[in-house]
């Protein structure tokens, strides 16, 4: 009977055709056509580089179970052993098998410039509870009588001027608001700083987002850390430690109780969510869970905080596809977060607008608000 290889033996086989110096950040690399021809040897090298990123750089690899690892490694081994001349698009279709089974809503393989992107196949359909009030804008802030309304559709690619304007506007309306509605529906993430600043002001204190934040510590992971030297990864001093993983541990912290005297806002807050909310969009939910007078209205968020912190965009050498992975793993306070996201306090049925439910909660059922991006 043939010996069944261990996970470590399967990993070593796939890593033999690449080295640390093959780990290159995507940067502004020119896109290549999906029809780019790859030789069998180039395919094998691409698979090995892909495997090196997955096994040694990707923050989630140590935390996935052995069954999943074996499935992934067997797929990659089969692609490697059966390599033949093919196009970049054909290779993407083969590597898709790996991405689709990893329960991570951030990890993706992207053929830049050609709208060819592969993400996990584990996303769930959520009910339609309306779209973000900001419509096509990044954010919108308004005050209707004594109700503050903040819609944040995206946190991606904000300019310094936009961040300053956002901060100035919400600081202007909160003192005049008795209730606050924060609409984060459709918010797939970006930089979390604007929403963390808002949450910290409301709470009067910064609370940890996770029990632990964990980073890989090996030559490949540390090389990638240097490629992204201006990121938050710098707070982990990996070069001076021998542990395979290093973490900042919040699990034993005594969390401060909510203090109305220090809080910037003490009225009811209604946070609107849907199934497209993930990543930095969910960080506002993570922070506001500590607020005693908050209700989440809508549907479960997607679940995208465990593996998506500090993204690394890694280049595959011949196809110029980018393999994008998180570098910091978050041990969340919510179990199975990546599969379930945050569950709302008030769950809306399909076709029910979460904004209407929020106003009903406030007791203004007949109060009409102009809603950009929502059809009445």
Predicted regions and their residues:
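Flexible, low-complexity junctional segments that flank or bridge functional domains
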Residues: 1-233, 254, 265-270, 283, ...
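Extended, charge-rich low-complexity interaction segments
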Residues: 208-214, 239-250, 326-343
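Glycine-/acidic-rich phosphate or pyrophosphate-binding loops and their flanking alpha/beta elements
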Residues: 251-263
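Active-site-adjacent substrate-binding region
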Residues: 292
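Low-complexity, Gly/Ser/Thr/Pro-rich intrinsically disordered linker/tail segments
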Residues: 328, 333-376
């Amino acid at each position: 009977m043939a010996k069944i290889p261990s996970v470590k033996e399967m990993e070593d086989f796939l890593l033999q055709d690449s080295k640390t110096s093959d780990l290159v950040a995507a940067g502004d690399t020119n896109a290549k056509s999906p029809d780019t021809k790859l030789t069998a040897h180039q395919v094998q090298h691409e698979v090995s580089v892909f495997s090196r990123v997955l096994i040694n750089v990707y923050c989630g690899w140590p935390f996935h179970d052995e069954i999943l690892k074996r499935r992934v490694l067997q797929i990659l081994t089969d692609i490697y052993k059966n390599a033949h001349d093919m196009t970049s698009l054909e290779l993407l279709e083969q590597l898709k098998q790996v991405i689709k089974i990893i329960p991570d809503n951030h990890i993706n393989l992207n053929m830049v410039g050609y709208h060819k992107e592969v993400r996990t196949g584990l996303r769930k359909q959520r009910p339609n509870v309306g779209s973000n009030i900001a419509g096509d804008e990044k954010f919108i802030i308004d005050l209707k009588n004594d109700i503050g309304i903040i819609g944040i559709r995206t946190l991606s690619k904000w300019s310094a001027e936009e961040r300053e304007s956002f901060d100035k506007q919400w600081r202007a309306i909160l003192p005049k608001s008795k209730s606050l509605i924060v609409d984060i529906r459709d918010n797939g993430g970006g930089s979390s700083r604007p929403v963390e600043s808002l949450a910290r002001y409301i709470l009067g204190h910064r609370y940890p987002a996770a029990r632990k934040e964990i980073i890989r510590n090996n030559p490949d992971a540390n090389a990638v850390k240097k490629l992204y030297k201006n990121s938050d990864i710098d707070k982990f001093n990996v070069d001076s430690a021998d542990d395979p993983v290093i973490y900042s541990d919040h699990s034993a912290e005594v969390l401060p109780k909510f203090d109305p005297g220090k809080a910037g806002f003490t009225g009811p807050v209604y946070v609107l969510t849907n199934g497209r909310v993930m990543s930095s969009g969910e960080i506002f939910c993570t922070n506001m869970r500590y607020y005693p007078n908050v209700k989440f209205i809508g549907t479960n968020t997607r679940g995208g905080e465990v593996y998506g912190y500090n993204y690394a965009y890694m280049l595959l050498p011949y196809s110029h596809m980018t393999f994008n992975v998180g570098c910091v793993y978050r041990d969340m306070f919510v179990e199975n977060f990546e599969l379930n996201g945050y569950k709302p306090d008030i769950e809306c049925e399909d076709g029910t607008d979460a904004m209407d439910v929020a106003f009903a909660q406030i007791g203004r059922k007949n109060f009409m608000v102009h809603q950009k991006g929502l059809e009445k």
